[in-house]
Amino acid sequence: MFNFTRQYSVKDGLITDELASHIVENLPARYASAETWKRIYSLQHDGASLQTMYLACEKEKARSGHPKGACILAVRDTDGDVFGVFIPDYLIPAPHYFGSEETFLWKYFPPKKYVHYPFVGNSNFVAYCTKSFLAFGGGNGRYSLWLDGSLEYAYSSRTPAFENNPLSYRGCPDQRIQIVDIELWVLE
């Protein structure tokens, strides 16, 4: 079993030890050895605001002194499914797409079903952060994961960037997903 240190006590957090062990199996080697996973944003504790999440990233970037940070975004929907993304960058608004081939999507359906979608490179649309939405993957007019600025809902569709199935268990592309919780973690 993978052991990691949590910066905060997260008794009911989205990333359980079991889920963390699945994510670690897919992390690039330089991040898989991270000993500390620090939660820098939680919708339940910090409020439903994309701007607050971006501000948490900016503060962490300034604190760490590193231009890039390894982030794990976890989302829980009203069906209880948890899904998200690993990206080796801070989530900060930019006027263009950013990210690398190390980025991947994942979904976790209790009990114990984990699916990993690596970046396949059929487009350069990895991540796009704006003041009004946050998106991962792109192409054909869709996003692999799109979250609105109020963090109340999301959409998920198959895209050329990840060739993923929709991340919500319902599996219906372009159907609104109601968000219950979001957490953003950085690896140190």
Curated annotation (Swiss-Prot):
Family: Belongs to the OXR1 family.
InterPro entries the record matches: TLDc_dom
GO molecular function, one term: ATPase inhibitor activity
PANTHER family, per database record: MUSTARD, ISOFORM V (PTHR23354:SF62), NUCLEOLAR PROTEIN 7/ESTROGEN RECEPTOR COACTIVATOR-RELATED (PTHR23354)
Keywords, alphabetical: Cytoplasm, Meiosis, Mitochondrion, Nucleus
Pfam families: TLD
Protein known as: Oxidation resistance protein 1
Subcellular location: Mitochondrion; Cytoplasm; Nucleus
One GO cellular component, as annotated: nucleus
Record has Nucleus as a keyword: yes
GO biological process: one example: regulation of cellular pH
Annotated ranges, domain TLDc: 13-188
Function in brief: May be involved in protection from oxidative damage. Has a role in meiosis.
